[in-house]
């Protein structure tokens, strides 16, 4: 399933929310790629914009093009390696907000369904108990609306399209999701209503715990609260004692 048209937002060109000599974090708008695509016309991306601003910037993780919110980059290869290792060992913690289709009855719960690529329908992913990788998402209802529900999503694993497929599996696809939602849910909003609001990680130089937060445009009531859901150590733990993702 190829991208038919790519017209990313240009204002603001870059929205840096935190920067020091080792890392840089930005608020990526919906509709902008995290990294360049293969066609030259898909070069414009969060990384490409930042590399003009900071030539040493390195990719640490990605957000789907349609997802907005907090994305973290490293400055230099050493910082890149240190941060990527935290994602690999599940030392980072994230909170997303989403508006989903339908009114959810259950206040909270979790989805534990293995995911893999749906190869004939790429880039779609699918639930697959034979070949899928373990995938776990926790969810909490924060606001019920007439036709939709705003939920807080806490991914424990970080699979491609995990939140989108897991919410679809509950019968509540994310509003504006042109891959997994029915037409009426897609047309209900002008963008995918999924936002990466909060990230908790260990600063790669100091090794002290750090949290960053980006307000959610479609749910401005969102507040920082990641440490209410996790109890990480204040200092970076020993990798040798941890299992990999």
Swiss-Prot record:
Write out the entry's keywords from A to Z. Isomerase, rRNA processing, tRNA processing
Q: Tell me the protein's name.
A: Dual-specificity RNA pseudouridine synthase RluA
Q: Main role? A: Dual specificity enzyme that catalyzes the synthesis of pseudouridine from uracil-746 in 23S ribosomal RNA and from uracil-32 in the anticodon stem and loop of transfer RNAs.
Tell me which domain of life the UniProt entry assigns to the organism this sequence originates from. Bacteria
Q: What is the organism of origin for this protein?
A: Vibrio cholerae serotype O1 (strain ATCC 39315 / El Tor Inaba N16961)
| Reactions it catalyzes | uridine(32) in tRNA = pseudouridine(32) in tRNA; uridine(746) in 23S rRNA = pseudouridine(746) in 23S rRNA
Q: What class of enzyme is it?
A: isomerase
What Gene Ontology molecular function terms does this protein carry?
A: 23S rRNA pseudouridine(746) synthase activity; pseudouridine synthase activity; RNA binding; tRNA pseudouridine(32) synthase activity
Q: Which PANTHER family match?
A: DUAL-SPECIFICITY RNA PSEUDOURIDINE SYNTHASE RLUA (PTHR21600:SF91), MITOCHONDRIAL RNA PSEUDOURIDINE SYNTHASE (PTHR21600)
Extract the InterPro entries matched here: PsdUridine_synth_cat_dom_sf (IPR020103), PsdUridine_synth_RluA-like_CS (IPR006224), PsdUridine_synth_RsuA/RluA (IPR006145), RluA_PseudoU_synthase (IPR050188)
What does the entry give for GO biological process?
Answer: enzyme-directed rRNA pseudouridine synthesis; tRNA processing
What's the EC number here? 5.4.99.28, 5.4.99.29
Classification via SUPFAM superfamilies: Pseudouridine synthase
Q: Which Gene3D superfamilies match?
A: Pseudouridine synthase (3.30.2350.10)
Catalytic residues (UniProt)? 64
> What is the gene name?
rluA
Q: Which family does it belong to?
A: Belongs to the pseudouridine synthase RluA family.
């Amino acid at each position: 399933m190829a991208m038919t048209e790519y017209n990313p937002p240009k204002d603001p060109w870059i929205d840096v929310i935190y920067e020091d000599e080792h890392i840089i974090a930005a608020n990526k708008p919906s509709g902008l790629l995290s990294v360049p695509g293969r066609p030259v016309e898909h070069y414009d991306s969060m990384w490409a914009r930042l590399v003009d601003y900071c030539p040493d910037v390195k990719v640490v993780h990605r957000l789907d093009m349609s997802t907005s919110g907090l994305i973290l980059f490293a400055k230099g290869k050493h910082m890149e390696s240190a941060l990527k290792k935290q994602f690999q060992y599940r030392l980072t913690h994230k909170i997303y907000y989403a508006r989903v289709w339908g009114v959810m009855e259950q206040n909270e719960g979790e989805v534990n369904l293995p995911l893999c690529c749906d190869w004939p329908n790429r880039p779609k992913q699918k639930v697959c108990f034979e070949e899928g990788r373990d995938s776990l998402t926790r969810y909490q209802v924060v606001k019920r609306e007439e036709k939709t529900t705003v939920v807080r999503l806490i991914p424990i694993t970080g699979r491609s399209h995990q939140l989108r497929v897991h919410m679809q599996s509950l019968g509540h696809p994310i509003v504006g999701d042109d891959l997994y939602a029915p037409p009426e849910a897609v047309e209900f909003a002008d963008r995918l209503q999924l936002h990466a609001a909060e990230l908790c990680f260990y600063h790669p130089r100091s090794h002290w715990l750090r949290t960053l937060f980006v307000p959610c445009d479609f749910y401005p009531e969102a507040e920082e609260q990641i440490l209410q859901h996790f109890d990480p150590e204040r200092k970076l733990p020993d990798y040798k004692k941890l299992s990999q993702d």
